[in-house]
Amino acid sequence: MDFLSKHTTCLSNLELNLAPGWQTVSAYFLLAAGSLFVASRALTFVRVLLSLFVLPGKSLRSFGPKGSWAVVTGASDGLGKEFSLQLARAGFNIVLVSRTASKLTTLSDEITSKYASVQTKTLAMDFARNEDSDYEKLKALVDELDVAILVNNVGKSHDIPTPFALTSQEEMTDIITINCMGTLRATQLIVPGMMQRKRGLILTMGSFGGLLPTPLLATYSGSKAFLQQWSTALGSELEEHGITVELVQAYLITSAMSKIRRASATIPDPRSFVKSVLSKIGRNGGSPSYAYSSSPYWSHGLMAYFLTCIAGTMGKFVTSKNRGMHESIRKRALRKAEREKAKKST
């Protein structure tokens, strides 16, 4: 009761002209509201822990029978390659879509040598060109297939962190064309078949850059924020048709895009990351505030929960820290470029 007395005294000091009885009622109300707030945050955190470490996701087989197909864009390297290999291991035939034909052939051979019963098809297309003829080829390829899973992995970031005013028009256009138009056009070709079959899974690779305003990666950050909103809206539209839509929120992963080679607790390799994604379909992980989204890798999930539920994504402090980190990365990249330029000139 000492706690309640202090709140009653506080209300008196605020000079709200409340009668003593109403001061007590108000104090009880504030205490109850605060307790509910703390309890709700605690329950949310428990849900996050259960989602990340205990509860399984949906079975991949619920999206299509044996002999059905998975389409993976940006398939030849990094996450795309790993998605292709792990989905093939799960028994899905694979359509590999990426820019470089030779890499697609190499990956196709690797898949069929490891999994003899799995079929593959390949399509070399440059999403940056946004050519109608390429999408017509993709449509002709998938229309004859039972596509159960689409992995929208194709993407591009800035070569190095760069202020928006200094970003080249070519890089800016490529990022928007590949990340946004490429994802939308590929999805629009495949969704009708899934709707007809009343099942399917659409995974789109998101980024913490879409959660956090990211200075020096402004165009990339904006493209991922767009995908966040688009994927959430699409998930609501397609849910009644039996199609699961999920945007995967990811922090850094060892890859050519991130230019990070050494894995750590917070930066997994593609194999570990993809395994977590495919084993946690339908679970929000560390993203309970975002419908049709997930942060399934354990450390990414904990970071996403902290940033979205505790720190807040739009706070000036968080944005400032994010800017400082990318300014440091830019300085190191520019120094490295100067050293390489000096070596070539000698």
Swiss-Prot record:
It is a single-pass membrane protein. It is an enzyme of class 1 (oxidoreductase). Keywords: Endoplasmic reticulum, Fatty acid biosynthesis, Fatty acid metabolism, Lipid biosynthesis, Lipid metabolism, Membrane, NADP, Oxidoreductase, Transmembrane, Transmembrane helix. GO terms for cellular component: endoplasmic reticulum membrane. InterPro entries: 3_ketoreductase_fungal, NAD(P)-bd_dom_sf, Sc_DH/Rdtase_CS, SDR_fam. PROSITE patterns: ADH_SHORT (PS00061). Its EC number is 1.1.1.330. NADP(+) binds at residues 71, 126, 134, 153, 220, 224, 253, 255. The chain crosses the membrane at residues 26-46. The keyword Flavoprotein does not apply. GO terms for biological process: fatty acid elongation; secondary metabolite biosynthetic process; sphingolipid biosynthetic process; very long-chain fatty acid biosynthetic process. It catalyses: a very-long-chain (3R)-3-hydroxyacyl-CoA + NADP(+) = a very-long-chain 3-oxoacyl-CoA + NADPH + H(+). The active site is at residues 220, 224. One of its GO terms (molecular function) is ketoreductase activity. The keyword Lipid biosynthesis applies. It is found in: Endoplasmic reticulum membrane. Belongs to the short-chain dehydrogenases/reductases (SDR) family. This is Very-long-chain 3-oxoacyl-CoA reductase. It comes from Aspergillus oryzae (strain ATCC 42149 / RIB 40) (Yellow koji mold).
